Amino acid sequence: MTPSQVAFEIRGTLLPGEVFAICGSCDALGNWNPQNAVALLPENDTGESMLWKATIVLSRGVSVQYRYFKGYFLEPKTIGGPCQVIVHKWETHLQPRSITPLESEIIIDDGQFGIHNGVETLDSGWLTCQTEIRLRLHYSEKPPVSITKKKLKKSRFRVKLTLEGLEEDDDDRVSPTVLHKMSNSLEISLISDNEFKCRHSQPECGYGLQPDRWTEYSIQTMEPDNLELIFDFFEEDLSEHVVQGDALPGHVGTACLLSSTIAESGKSAGILTLPIMSRNSRKTIGKVRVDYIIIKPLPGYSCDMKSSFSKYWKPRIPLDVGHRGAGNSTTTAQLAKVQENTIASLRNAASHGAAFVEFDVHLSKDFVPVVYHDLTCCLTMKKKFDADPVELFEIPVKELTFDQLQLLKLTHVTALKSKDRKESVVQEENSFSENQPFPSLKMVLESLPEDVGFNIEIKWICQQRDGMWDGNLSTYFDMNLFLDIILKTVLENSGKRRIVFSSFDADICTMVRQKQNKYPILFLTQGKSEIYPELMDLRSRTTPIAMSFAQFENLLGINVHTEDLLRNPSYIQEAKAKGLVIFCWGDDTNDPENRRKLKELGVNGLIYDRIYDWMPEQPNIFQVEQLERLKQELPELKSCLCPTVSRFVPSSLCGESDIHVDANGIDNVENA
C-alpha cells in the first residue's frame, strides 16, 4: 500500500519531564495502546505554548483515528524491555481526531492540546504502572492529632507533609524527550461542604486541621516502599513576639512515616498512629492518627485509549432505573413479585423499559463476583431428633464459595424474623434457575440484552458513626484484590453495554476511578437522613460534601437519597452547576408524584422498585434511539413501522426487506 508521511503538530505546555504523545487506531500509532504510542519532539517556542511534532508513515487513503496525551515515558525495567508510560492528561472527545492521508507528504496542525472542533475535553490519566498512596487527616471518628504536652492541649494545628525519596545524581537528569525515571508527585486536597481545593504546593506552615474538613495527601510513585514521609506540626494563633523570634514560628514537632511500614503490612487500607516528636528535645509530645489507602494498577489488563465514558453523559430525559432489577423483594413495604437481584428480576425490569438495571456485587469466598444485596445470608441447617427440621444461621456471604452459594439451602436474613421459616426456605428451593439468588456477575453480563444498561453497585462494609459495621463485619477482603477481580470481570465481558458503577464507600469510588479509564462511577450518599443512621466517614455525611468529593476525584457524579433531595431540591441544580450527573435512590422514589417532581427538577436517573407497575412491556430509551437512527438512515424501514414507536415491530413484518430489528432491540442490518 502506498505510504504517506504525516507530520502531526500540537501546541501545549508541559511540566519538567513530561512529553506529548500520539496514540491511534493503526499499528504506526500503537493501536490505541499508550505503551506503543509515539512521542512528539519540541520544534520551537511560540510564546505561551511550545510546538511539538512527530512525523509518522501511514497508509495513503486509509482513515485513521487518534488522540494526544501527555505524561512520562519511563526507562524499561530490563535491558531491551518495553518502556512504561504514565498518562497524566489525555483527550477524551467522544469522536477522536481523524485523518485520511491522500498525499505523499502532509502536515496536520491540530492546534492546542485538548481542543478538537472547538471543544476542550481532557481527562486525568489512570494508574498504568505507578502506585498511589493516599494519606488522610480528618475528624470522622476522633481528632487526628492528640497532644499530651499541657501548654499545647488547647492549641489548633497546621500540618505540612514533606516527601523524601532516593536522590538523583546530576548525571541522571535528562531532557524531557528521553526516557527517564519518574519523580514522585505530591498533591494536597482539602474537601468540605463548601468547596474542594487541590494544590501541588503548600504554605510554609502547611494547612490547618478543621473538624468539618477532610485533608488528603496523594502521592504517585514507582517506589512505594522507598519513601520517607515527614509531617511537621505548627501551632496556630501565635503571639507576635513568638513569630518575630523564631525562624520556624510555631513549629512544635515532627512525625515520620516510612512507606515501607505500609508496604510490609500487606494491606490496601488502614490507620497508623505515629508519635509526634518535640522540635527541640526530641521527646514525644503527642501522636497523629493517619488514615491511608494504597491504590495499585489493575494487573493483567491494559486499558486503551479507544474510548472513555468516565466523564461522559449524553443529555437525555431522566432515565428510569430498575432497583435490584424489578425491585426490593425483602425489606420494603410493598415487595416486588420477582426475587431481587436475580436474572429473572433484571430481565423483568429490562422488558418494561428500564434504561438501566441496578444491582449489587461482591465476592464469594473463592473470589467469584456474585450479585446479591446483603453482606450476609441465612444457612438452613437440619437438627437431629427435632420435629422442626429448619434452623437458620446467619453467615457472611464471603464465607461461602460460589458452588456453596448455588447448592446450599440459603435464604434472606429477614427469614430470621419470619413466622414461617419453613415456607421461605421451600420457596427458595423450588425456584426456577433464573430466579435463583447469587448469579455470578459474568452470568448476568452474558444473559441480558446488551442494550440494557447496568448500574453496578460495588458493595463494601460501611461503619456507622456509633461504631457498628454492616453485617457486623469489621474486616473484609483486601480492597485492591476485591476491585481487581470485579473490574476485570466487567471489562472483559461488557461488550458495548452502557455501564455505570456506584458505591457508598468513597475509597471504592476513588480506586475504581484510578484503576480504569472506561466506565464512570457515582458516589452513593444518604446525606442527612431520618431513616438511616449516620455513617462514620465524613465524606458520606452530607450531600454537599459528597459533591465536593466527587469533584475532587473527577467522578461522573453522585447518587443521592431521595429523602435528602425532597428536603433540599436546590442540591440538584447545585450538582449540575458543578458539572456532576445526579441520580436518586430510596423508598421515596417509589412514589410516582415524587418521581414527577424530581424529573421536573432535572435529576438524570431515578432508581425505584416495581417498574412493571408503572410501565408496560416496551423497549427502553436506548432501543428507541437506535430504531430512530435506523429509520433516518434506512428509508425502507419507515414503511415497516408505525409512526409512533412504542415497541419494536416483529421481523416477520419486514419480510419483503433485507432489514430487520431483532426482538431484543439489537439492530441487525444485512446487505445495507
From Swiss-Prot:
One cellular component term from this protein's GO annotations in UniProt: cytosol
The CBM20 domain, residue ranges: 1-115
Keywords, comma-separated and alphabetical: Cytoplasm, Hydrolase, Phosphoprotein
Pfam families (UniProt xref): C2_GDE1 (PF25329), CBM_20 (PF00686), GDPD (PF03009)
Tissue spec: Widely expressed, with highest expression in spinal chord.
Record-linked PROSITE patterns: CBM20, GP_PDE
Residues modified to Phosphoserine: S175, S424
A biological process term (GO) from this entry: skeletal muscle tissue development
E.C. number(s) listed in UniProt: 3.1.4.2
A GO molecular-function annotation: starch binding
UniProt modified residues of type Phosphotyrosine: Y608
Role of this protein: May be involved in the negative regulation of skeletal muscle differentiation, independently of its glycerophosphocholine phosphodiesterase activity.
Family the entry assigns: Belongs to the glycerophosphoryl diester phosphodiesterase family.
Protein name (record): Glycerophosphocholine phosphodiesterase GPCPD1
